[in-house]
Structure formats: C-alpha cells, structure tokens
C-alpha cells in the first residue's frame, strides 16, 4: 500500500508539472505576424500620417485623414488617393508642408483630421479634427461643416476619437485635453493631464452632452455591439474604460481592460471584441529583436484574445478589420496605409 501511494504521488506530481508547463501556452493570446503587408502609398511629397481608416456604406475606401488637413479617398491602384474633404476655408498652397514649413507649423490653421466614422444610413462622414473640432461632410465630399468646436463655453483643444451609433445616428467623440493640443500630445501623458472629456452629439437637435469629464487622455471610442456602452481608450494609463449609456449603470464609467501598451483608436472586430491599436509597448526598448506589439484584440470580458506583432518602425493608430479578412492599419507617422491579410 505504501508503494502504491508513492507511485500515485509521483504520478500526481508529474501531472501537476505538465499542467504548469502547458497551461500558460494554452491560455496565452493567439498571435500573428503583420510584418509582411501591402502598402497603399499616399501622394508623393510631404503628406503622411493616415491616422484613421474608414469605409463608406458601399464599401468604398479606405478614407483617411492626413497631415496637410485633408481627408483622402482611395480609388484603387490606378487612380490612387484623391481629395474627399477638408475643413472650411482650406488653402491648399498654405497647407502644403515644405522643408522649411513642417505640418506642425500649419496644422492649427489647416486642421488635422484624426478619428473618422461614416453614418452608414445617411452617408455622412464625421471627422474628429484635432484643431477644428467635430466636423461633418455629406455624401460625395466637399467642404466639411464644423458642428462642435466648444462645449459649455470651453473650446475643444484636442478632438480625437469618434464613433457613430448606426441605429440612432448619435455621435460619440472625445476631447483629449483642455490644456494641450495635438502638437503637445506628449505633455498630456507626461503631466498626467486629466481634463479630457467624452461627449455625445445628437444630429437631430445639434445638442452636445458631456458624458464624462476629468478623464485621463481619452482617445479612441467605440460603441459596443449591443449598444449598451462605449469602450474608450485611455492612452496615458494604458487602459480601456467602459462607459454605460443604457441600463441601470447609465452614466457610470469603470475599468474594462489593462493593456500592454499605449492605446489609440478602438474598432470592433469581426471575430468579436475590439481591435486596439498600440502606438508602442510599455517600457519598450529601442534595441533587441525588431518586433513589438502593434495591436491587441480584446474580448467583451476585457481579456486579450489576440495579438498582432510587427517591426518597431510601425506604430499604428488604428486597426480596421474588413469582412474579406483584410486588416487596414493607420499610422500618424508613415506615408501609407498598411493592409494585412490573415493567413
């Protein structure tokens, strides 16, 4: 009996060791490499930074805002990119960057489109312009109209993320800081600035409601699939927040996910959950292996389900997944939109 117990104990210990060895791998998030990608190059010159990626109701696009203040539309390899919209009073000559006049010197006048989102029913494109505020342009493009540039008498300093409830047409958007603009974005993180706001615009009444104030670097925003809450990226703290817009918790915000990097835009995934673009990892080192996290897919429970990796030279600001399996990647630095195909 003593010998039998010894064998049982040994078998139990061996089983525990095997579980400890293999369970972490089984529980780890799936990962895929996005190093090899197709590029949709922006017009040659000094234009760069296709920060957000959007498609209209007919599946045309992508559309993306760039560093000279315009929103461009991709028309295929033959035609490439063409101007779709820009802010009021846009002067193409003055807004064209040169070696002696970088876009940072002109963007406060020319605008800097960040988040983009179509209302699929109306065809309207909503634009979160860092300097001009929340704008809208109708189907076909042209000059955009500024809808909101201040709320409760306080100017929008750093309009950033936007999403549209495709059922009601309500528009949700963020102002990342009352104290700093986009050109000073590093100060928002460095100082721990907590003056950001999450807002709602009603296109039927033009009313604007502040849903939450005193936020730390609110960035991208996404309406949940069931339309009960918003998922908001908090860049400096490397977190996602959940803000309830329906049900008994309406008006309440709570932590949703801790992230391994600094999040930018948040977009729904066709496989469930949300793709969160990571501008860079926490405590990322410039040397070593040329690979880092580009994005993570977070499930409805806040757990990381999937990781996307790629070279450190790529720092995405948005991940947009299409039904055909293609993933479009925006960047505030690169002169192209990346397209990755799932294997």
Feature roles, as predicted:
Residues 38-71, 314-316:
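Beta-strand-rich domains and repeat architectures in extracellular enzymes and scaffolds
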Residues 258-309:
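Loop/turn-rich, solvent-exposed surfaces of beta-rich toroidal or solenoidal domains
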Residues 98-114, 120, 124, 128-189, ...:
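Asp-box/WD-like beta-propeller blade repeats and closely related beta-sheet repeat scaffolds
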Residues 56-59, 118-122, 164-168, 225-227, ...:
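Residue-level detector of Asp-centered blade-edge/turn motifs that repeat once per structural unit
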Residues 40-46, 85-88, 105-109, 147-154, ...:
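Surface loop/turn motifs at the tips and blade-to-blade linkers of beta-strand repeat domains
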Residues 75-79, 138-142, 201-206, 244-249, ...:
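Short loop/turn segments that connect beta-strands within beta-propeller blades
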Residues 25-49, 94-105, 303-305:
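A short helix->beta-strand "capping" segment at the edge of beta-propeller domains
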